[in-house]
Amino acid sequence: MNQTQSYMDVHTSHFSSPQPYGSHGATAGGMVPYSHYQQPPPLLPPGSAGYPSTPGSYSYPYSNGVASTTQPASNSISSQVPAQILPLPAMTSHTVTPHGYVSGAAQSQQNAVHDPTGQTCPPGAKPRVTATLWEDEGSLCYQVEAKGVCVARREDNHMINGTKLLNVAGMTRGRRDGILKSEKVRHVVKIGPMHLKGVWIPYERALDFANKEKITDLLYPLFVHNIGGLLYHPANSNRTNMVVHDSQQRRLEGSQTARTSQGPQAPALHHHHSMNGSVPSHMPQASASTPQTNGRPELNRAHTFPTPPASASSLIGIPNQGSTYDWNSQNINSTVQTSQNVPIDNGLNSTRSMPTTPATTPPGNNLQGMPPYQNQPAYDSSKSYYSAAPSSQAQYASQPLPAHSLTYGQPMMKDLGSSGRPPLGPVEQEHDEVKVDRYNQPNGQVTNGTEEENGQQQEPEYVQDNVAGSYANRNSYTYTTNPSVSSLSGDHSQLGGSPSHQNGSDRMTPRTAGTNPPPQWSQGYNTPPRAVPAGSISNIVSDTRGAPNGDSYAPGTAYASNYSGYSSVNGSSMGSTKRMRDDDDDHLSRSDGRENEYETKRRKTLTEPPVGGAFMQMQQQPVPAGGVMRRR
């Protein structure tokens, strides 16, 4: 403090008290006007060493002016911001009348640096100055009102609100903003009280604008250097002292916090003590009771914030430490293989001031009441829902058509009888328009309703689901091996009239269905509904002699002869001319929709699975409406 005080007093004594230079004679008088700008304090004459011992001797020249009250304030301010007082060197020179040569030098110095206008009170004017604390900027502001506009001036750097200043001059907004934008030194304030918003400009530029606009006398005492001295009215001196002291205190705190925040040690947040049990030893342990020495209030954040979940270190690979609350190294579902105990934070101090809510209560003594996890394998092989897919197909064995097998929201077959067969008659009427749409069947033909056609409602565009199931679970299908089928030599499959003969989808032909119902109907539907085999006349003429194990899926060569123009149909030994007439009608009705059928095949090939798609496509093409026989 003594060093800065001597620095401050030497600067003020150059133009106010020349007595310490009495031993130097005439050289001191010639040195006074230049030493203020050119000589730093270490290069002063040897007489300056005695300045700190007599600090009270420098206040006597100010006994006849108002600046005597500001001398202690300037000393206290200079300890923090000494450079901010220097722009106003002639602060008290107009009131001080010391020896002649010093006052002349100081007066010439003032004329060279500052404009004297705005310093004297105009005749008849009554100075009105108010002061307010600008909390956002941490400064005291002096305010002068003129023409209903409040113009403010900061105490710390003496900048003036240029926007309000030019508003007093009555300047238009465009011209005002253009002038203020061209200023090199300016400070734009957009947040705060209305009278403090605007563009702040330095003191000298504001005084130039006021002189140009001839509003200097209106704004008196805004430009008075010692504007703070005008606040010392006998009626409100106590309040003014409080305001100035508060402003200085805020400035001191601001500079102190700015200094301490740049220090080597950041302020500790005391959050580490909640992780005492799991933090490695190389991490600094900050005690909650250690007071801080950097001047800022202590932040006990760990007493007000909830405990971090699992202390954030139980998830990191930290060396195993014995703690009081452990999870007993249970392998949860045998899938998480932990090599060490997972510690829950146990360093919770008793100084916590939180309610014991479920979110903040540590897993403490109530942990013993928790039942341990059962050590069980991740997948139970005995459960059917974890087993392989083929065994799950057995649930379709003796059910006609389960409701959940109708995937993708296809219409459910509502008219199934007790034997699992659909009725043969007028059920097809509700689906007739669909078949006309797809196969170009004439509207006059009413076809018999077989299970193939009812299964057709489930089949379009979703064939790959059932195809994949039929390939994957081929062994679960129970195709009945009929000796009557295997003993057929060359006859047509429907000429034999055997009631036990079944086509590929476990159904009987309509001719033999009514006379002798077979016993195989109860166990025929053992699979989910799959696509219909053999979509052409080959369903009637299909040669099943070469199929192994009675499976009606014949090799591809069996279908090649049937697709070659139906020569085998007309050339085979038919039993009756009535059946040949039916086949001829069927062939004619098939020839109309032939082109559409191939288009349907091509479209559906795109939706088939890649494995076996072409071969399954031949077998899954449905029998069209007139393919089996027409009802008489």
UniProtKB/Swiss-Prot annotation:
Compositionally biased residues, Low complexity: 377-386, 558-576
Q: Which Pfam families match?
A: KilA-N (PF04383)
> What organism is recorded for this protein?
Talaromyces marneffei
Example GO biological process:
sporulation resulting in formation of a cellular spore
Q: Which family does it belong to?
A: Belongs to the EFG1/PHD1/stuA family.
Question: Gene for this protein?
Answer: stuA
A Gene Ontology molecular function term for this protein is:
sequence-specific DNA binding
Organism taxonomic ancestry = Eukaryota, Fungi, Dikarya, Ascomycota, Pezizomycotina
Q: What's in the keyword line of the UniProt record?
A: Conidiation, DNA-binding, Nucleus, Sporulation, Transcription, Transcription regulation
Q: What is this protein called?
A: Cell pattern formation-associated protein stuA
